[in-house]
């Protein structure tokens, strides 16, 4: 499977009261990967929401990714995204199997991406590239670094951090395969606007939905 397209990431606070409606609106516009990101300790609720997302993703032929929780991903039979504080990828690969999608946060360090590739990552993520509400303290990445990463890393490259329709084009031009978006997608006033934005991100990547 070629990993290229819009990578939608949920935010529980941003989507409060409209969670499934906005997610489905995004899926309707075309989403390659959907990451369920919820840092709360309410495991029962997280399982409930993740199961609903798995059902939606199945309907729209989108791959579901769980943030930072390989055990939940294994329980649901979906992929996982791991940060640098979540340990090596090898145990997650062993747990989830050879076909699961596993992503790795690499901040702005190409060496981390090369290591992740050796450990069996499906894609690597660099960022933040712009000011971000979700990760305000994350180390900054540059388009120059992205171009270098594209030359050195064979895996699909995901970019994250304050990405909007207005600033995404240079990232695509410098080698990004996946545009990871939170507020730039879900910070919309209506489900119709979420769908429009999703389609517009796919247009930037020359992907027809």
From Swiss-Prot:
Q: Might you give the EC number(s) for this enzyme?
A: 2.5.1.3
The reaction(s) annotated as catalysed by this protein in its Swiss-Prot or TrEMBL entry are:
2-[(2R,5Z)-2-carboxy-4-methylthiazol-5(2H)-ylidene]ethyl phosphate + 4-amino-2-methyl-5-(diphosphooxymethyl)pyrimidine + 2 H(+) = thiamine phosphate + CO2 + diphosphate; 2-(2-carboxy-4-methylthiazol-5-yl)ethyl phosphate + 4-amino-2-methyl-5-(diphosphooxymethyl)pyrimidine + 2 H(+) = thiamine phosphate + CO2 + diphosphate; 4-methyl-5-(2-phosphooxyethyl)-thiazole + 4-amino-2-methyl-5-(diphosphooxymethyl)pyrimidine + H(+) = thiamine phosphate + diphosphate
Quote the cofactor binding remark.
Binds 1 Mg(2+) ion per subunit.
Q: Name one Pfam family in it.
A: TMP-TENI
Provide the Gene Ontology terms for cellular component.
Answer: cytoplasm
What SUPFAM superfamilies would the database entry show?
Thiamin phosphate synthase (SSF51391)
Any one of the GO BP annotations: thiamine diphosphate biosynthetic process
Key word Coiled coil present in the record?
Answer: no
Q: Which residues form the signal peptide?
A: none
Which NCBIfam families did the record assign?
thiE (TIGR00693)
What the protein does comes down to: Condenses 4-methyl-5-(beta-hydroxyethyl)thiazole monophosphate (THZ-P) and 2-methyl-4-amino-5-hydroxymethyl pyrimidine pyrophosphate (HMP-PP) to form thiamine monophosphate (TMP).
Task: Check the record and name the PANTHER family matching this protein.
Answer: THIAMINE-PHOSPHATE PYROPHOSPHORYLASE, THIAMINE-PHOSPHATE SYNTHASE
According to UniProt, the name of this protein is Thiamine-phosphate synthase
Organism classification: Bacteria, Pseudomonadati, Pseudomonadota, Gammaproteobacteria, Pseudomonadales
Q: Name the gene.
A: thiE
């Amino acid at each position: 499977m070629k990993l290229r397209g819009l990578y939608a990431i949920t935010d529980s606070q941003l989507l409060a009261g409209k969670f499934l409606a906005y997610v489905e609106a995004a899926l309707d516009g075309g989403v390659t990967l959907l990451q369920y990101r919820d840092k709360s300790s309410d495991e029962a609720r997280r399982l409930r929401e993740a199961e609903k997302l798995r059902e939606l993703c199945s309907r729209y032929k989108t791959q579901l990714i769980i943030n930072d929780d390989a055990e939940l991903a294994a329980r649901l039979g979906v992929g996982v995204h791991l940060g640098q504080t979540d340990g090596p990828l090898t145990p997650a690969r062993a747990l989830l199997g050879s076909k699961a999608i596993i992503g790795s946060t690499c901040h702005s360090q190409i060496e981390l991406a090369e290591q992740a590739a050796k450990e069996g990552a499906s894609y690597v993520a660099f960022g933040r590239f712009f000011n971000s509400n979700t990760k305000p303290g994350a180390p900054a990445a540059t388009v120059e670094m992205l171009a270098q990463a594209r030359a050195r890393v064979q895996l699909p490259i995901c970019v994250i951090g304050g990405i909007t329709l207005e600033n995404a084009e240079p990232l695509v031009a410098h080698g990004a395969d996946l545009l990871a978006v939170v507020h730039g997608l879900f910070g919309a006033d209506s489900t119709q606007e979420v769908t429009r934005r999703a389609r517009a991100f796919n247009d930037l990547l020359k992907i027809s939905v």
